[in-house]
């Protein structure tokens, strides 16, 4: 399972090259290693639902796995780029790949810069909570145990080339 990535979007504005290097080139390095060894039974890439771009809040149905990718920031663009590389390796070299598109995970031992823990700590200190944009954005969150259970199911699927929304 390929979880490795730069994910904290605020850091993107400080050093966007690291996002490209880690999320695209890092994925390329892993894919090449898998191709060269020929020993990989399954390559599960962990992506993000942000590759879909902005979702209409009035939509009855959310994004489907076959929905067009319309990333809106460099983070989601690098994850979409990595997905394109992965599918190319699947088609060109027969690498057995699966992509899982998740969203924000929360739970114990979360990084301090992640939103839920960051807001809790700031609120406990009576500090201002930073809001990006006009504050109308909505995000989904998954509890870490639920994510683990989901990846356990995906790990045992034999549907190579498929994308799953988590």
Predicted regions and their residues:
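Hydrophobic pocket-lining residues that define ligand/cofactor binding sites across diverse proteins
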Residues: 34, 90, 123, 154-155
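A generic structural signal for secondary-structure junctions
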Residues: 56-57, 120, 124
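Alpha-helix initiation/capping motif
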Residues: 67-75, 108-112, 140, 166
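Short alpha-helical segment that forms part of, or immediately flanks, the ligand-binding pocket
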Residues: 17, 120-121, 139
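N-terminal Rossmann-like NAD(P)+-binding domain of SDR-like oxidoreductases, especially those catalyzing
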Residues: 1-105, 145
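Glycine/proline-rich active-site loop of Rossmann-fold NAD(P)-dependent oxidoreductases
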Residues: 80, 105-118, 125-127, 132, ...
């Amino acid at each position: 399972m390929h979880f490795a990535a730069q994910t904290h979007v605020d850091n993107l504005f400080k050093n966007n090259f690291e996002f490209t290097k880690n999320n695209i080139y890092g994925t390329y390095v892993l894919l090449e290693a898998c191709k060269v060894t020929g020993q990989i039974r399954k390559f599960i890439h962990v992506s993000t639902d942000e590759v879909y771009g902005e979702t209409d809040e009035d939509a009855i149905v959310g994004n489907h796995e076959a929905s067009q990718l319309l990333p809106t920031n460099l983070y989601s663009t690098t994850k979409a780029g990595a997905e394109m590389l992965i599918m190319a390796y699947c088609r060109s070299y027969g690498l057995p790949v699966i992509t899982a598109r998740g969203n924000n995970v929360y739970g114990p031992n979360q990084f301090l810069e992640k939103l839920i823990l960051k807001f809790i700590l700031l609120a406990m200190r009576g500090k201002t909570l930073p809001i990006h944009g006009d504050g109308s954005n909505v995000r989904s969150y998954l509890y870490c145990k639920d994510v683990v259970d989901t990846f356990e199911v995906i790990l045992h699927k034999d549907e190579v080339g498929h994308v799953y929304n988590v």
